[in-house]
Every structure is written in structure tokens, then in C-alpha cells.
């Protein structure tokens, strides 16, 4: 959510930003916000003036009664009653206008960074940099579930009977590999100075609307029936929510947290869930990182964060590249974002395994996360988030890039301590 004062003073700039995001249907919201904000402020001013007048006039009643001027006192009482009646009309009206302003402001996208490429959808995303040499081996690489089945490592049929499509059972060495990746990612981020956190796996609606747009909420979140609770789609949401309604000491910034959690998503978007596989599913695990920092530091943190993910993937012998997300591919709260994509030798192309985002002060405004500076003034922080590793997708990239012609899978040195010293997985079939 952008600053209301900024919108008042720069309506054309806000409209231009909406156009850059190819959301022309939201253009009327800007004028609507200005109109209702004006009405709300006028109602507030009238109410303030009437309260002052009521206080002033009310003082006359006692004096008039003491002077025996009962008739004049009754006239003043009638005037006070009229003022009170008008105030009872104004107060709900002011709230109605303010609620309308807030409702519209929540729909207006954040101002994107000037460096963001302009484009309608993800086909306009721009490749930034490649890390590691993409290799296509001289033997055929099976589909990832077929590789897992060679190790008796996955059972999709049983999961389908138990929970439906979009779920899985991981077993044996593949399950161990999954757990090893999350443990390694946890220690990797702790080594970068991040504080390890196990957050709530459910959050209230005020946190949900504080961290994401209504469109994202509808497409992603599972609601607990009869409760004001939602299953998290990413631990970023509950980690950022930790700071809701707080005024923080500037000297303690930045807050850097990393967490492991299960994640639950409806995947109602254009892609939907995968028929067979673990790429796009309803339930998965993820190691996430967030940063809460001073506004002037967020660009530097953004660069650090995506580089951490690249470093981790390269330590597991997986080639990756980064893609700069274009304006139309950015979620409404994001200022700037890039995807990290891993090389798939089977598909001979890259596929998304994570994303890094700078949200400016959008989440902080919604959640009222502020900082008190040395001068005593309060301001909103900036928030950032980044995928460290999402093991189901990482498994795909890892298995394909570390597969040998005989069906065995190499375990990189970085991961071996988390696999009991195992250097290679040997298939059972």
C-alpha cells in the first residue's frame, strides 16, 4: 500500500505506474481515493468544528440558568442537541469514507523501481546472469518421478487416495535427501548471520491482508472453516507478521530471519497443479528468509539475498540463472523482484525454483511496522523476502543434474554430512 499523501500529491505518477503494470481497470481507483479522502477530511473537519462549538456553547447553559435566563438556556440546549444530532450523522459518514479510501488503496499497486523492465507477463522477464555451465549428458534423463521411483522414493497413488491430486509420499533415500536439503539450507543461512525461526503455520486474516493482495489471497490461501485462521502459503507471511503493530528501535535493524515450514497453496492460478510430480503442488516445505531494514538499506539487502540462493544452489552442483521480473509479472506489493531458475538437463531449459522480492514499505504500512529514529521521528521499515530452497523443486533440479548413466545420484560434498557421509545414492531398480 502506497502513502496516501504521496497519492494526493502525485496522482498522475500513480496512474502511470498502474499503466506500466497493465492494470488499466484500476485507474479509476486513484480519482476515487482522492474524492473519498476529500469527503473524509471535510467530514472530520466539520465534526471537529462542531465538537469545539458544542463545548463552547454548553458552557453557556449553566451561566444562563444561574442568571435566571431559563428561556435562553433552553434555546442553547436545543442548539447543543442539534449539534449532537449532526455529530451522530457525521461520525459514521467519516468512517464510511475512510473505509472506502482504505479499500481502494489496498487495490492500488506499489510504485515499481525504475530499473524494472516493462512488460505484460512473465514472457517479458529479462535474463540477468547465469551461474554454472548448463550440461546436457549423453544419456536420457527420465522424468523426476521416474528417477524417484527407482529408489522406491515416491508414492503418488497412495497420496491421491489419502488427500487427492497435488500431494505426495516421499520415502527412503529421497525423503532423507529432502530433509538433508532443508537442514543444509537452515545451517547455510545461519552461517550468513540470519536468526533461525520456527513460526506459526497459521495466521489471522489481518496478517494475510497485510502481506499480500486480495487477488493473491484468493488464489493461494486455505481458510480454516469457522476460524479467523489461514494456512500459510509461505513462512515469509508469519515471519513478517511477527512485527505487526510494533515500533522498533532503529539501532536493532536489520532483523534477519530464516525459517523452515510446510506451505499450503490452492494454486488456483493459470498454471494449476501438476498431474504427476512435485513441481506445483498443494503442500510442500520451504526454507525462507526475510529482512526488515531501514529504507535506505533495502536495495543492498535485495542484492545480497538473491546471491545467497545462487550460492547455495551452486554448492549443490546445480547451474542457475536469475531473471528480472517485468512490471506485469510483479505482484502488487512488490517494488522489484527476480526469479532464480535452475537448469533442467531433461527439458534443456531453466525452470523457477525461487524468487527474491523487495516490497518497500508496502507490507510495513499495512501491518504498522515502524521504527523510531535517533531524532525521535517514526517511519515505516522496508521488508524483503527470498526463497532459500523449496526442496520439492530442488529435488527435481538436484536429481537431474547429479544423475549418472547407471542411475545412481552423486551427493555433493556440502550435503554429505547431512546424509550420514553418503557419497552416492544407488537405485533399487
What are these regions (language model features)?
Residues 1-134, 149, 153:
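N-terminal alpha-helical targeting/anchoring segments
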